[in-house]
């Protein structure tokens, strides 16, 4: 959910409480619940480990919350680090126009320059055209005739199918093998030690022989991300990759994105996750109504802009 939809959800929860209803929320992101909670039940390994009153839960320090793998109650307290990168080149997108109906374009971009070897956060409200841009960039939309130039070489739609790899928002469409390990091996038969290393870094090694569809939602997301990491593609596109992840696993994904960036690959991350953005992203691309609103590097000034977008809009 974007910030506006999160506000609507918070408003509805408040109404339900006023009506005397009991509301149980299984959640990793806690900031929007800060003023609503009456009780916090902390589960670990299938057991109730802690049971807090609202007052006691809100007294937990940022360090204590992090040790428990909890997202912070206060986004402003989350540590931020600038990750600007001097790009060695750019990825040029031209004539990216697309519409799902005969009405106005869902995507309306004449030209767009993306920094190579960056981790680019693609932000915007629901319906802004973020996922459409991702699908067009990856060559998944036949009616988008745009061209992408990388290192001076043009790639048409079909050629981009082997240039890019996309982790979709609903990863159930992408998990089709009999085991987690086979899912990664299907990406060009990478070396077994590489498969194990990636699974280990994403806390999935113990599930290597498990069927992907038997995993939890967050584990499935991490399997799809692991598959992208071993794909060997130059451009990775991830659509809401941390929506179901706790703090620890979000940080593991952030670390992997930084590693990819250091390898000279480019990642586009469609996200409403402020903590992920300030943990690893180097640039921001802001879309609304299918049009680019702004682009900026996440240097000190850029961090202030992204904080304003997420925190001041709460």
List each model region and its residues:
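Helix-to-loop junction immediately C-terminal to a conserved catalytic motif
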Residues: 138
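Conserved ABC ATPase signature
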Residues: 211-215, 219
């Amino acid at each position: 959910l974007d910030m506006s939809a999160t506000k609507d959800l918070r408003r509805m929860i408040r109404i339900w409480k006023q009506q005397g209803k009991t509301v149980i929320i299984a959640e990793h992101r806690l900031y929007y619940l800060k003023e609503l909670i009456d009780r916090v039940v902390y589960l670990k390994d299938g057991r109730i480990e802690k049971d807090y009153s609202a007052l006691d839960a809100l007294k937990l320090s940022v360090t204590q919350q992090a040790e428990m793998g909890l997202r912070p109650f206060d986004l402003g307290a989350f540590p931020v680090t600038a990750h600007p990168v001097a790009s060695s080149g750019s990825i040029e997108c031209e004539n990216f126009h697309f519409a799902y109906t005969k009405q106005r374009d869902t995507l309306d971009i004449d030209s767009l320059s993306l920094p190579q070897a960056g981790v680019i956060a693609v932000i915007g409200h629901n319906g802004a055209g973020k996922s459409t841009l991702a699908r067009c960039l990856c060559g998944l939309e036949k009616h988008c005739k745009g061209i992408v130039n990388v290192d001076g070489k043009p790639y048409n739609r079909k050629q981009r199918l082997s240039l890019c790899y996309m982790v979709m928002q609903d990863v159930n469409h992408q998990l089709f093998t009999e085991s987690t390990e086979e899912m990664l091996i299907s990406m060009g038969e990478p070396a077994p030690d590489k498969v194990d290393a990636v699974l280990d870094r994403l806390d999935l090694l113990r599930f290597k022989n498990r069927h992907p569809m038997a995993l939890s939602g967050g584990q499935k997301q991490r399997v799809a991300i692991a598959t992208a990491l071993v794909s060997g593609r130059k451009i990775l596109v991830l659509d809401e990759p941390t929506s179901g992840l706790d703090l620890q696993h979000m940080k593991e994904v952030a670390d992997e994105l930084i590693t990819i960036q250091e390898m000279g690959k480019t990642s586009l991350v469609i996200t409403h996750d402020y903590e992920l953005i300030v943990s690893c992203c180097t640039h921001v691309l802001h879309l609304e109504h299918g049009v680019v609103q702004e682009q900026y590097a996440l240097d000190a000034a850029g961090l202030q802009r992204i904080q304003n977008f997420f925190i001041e809009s709460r």
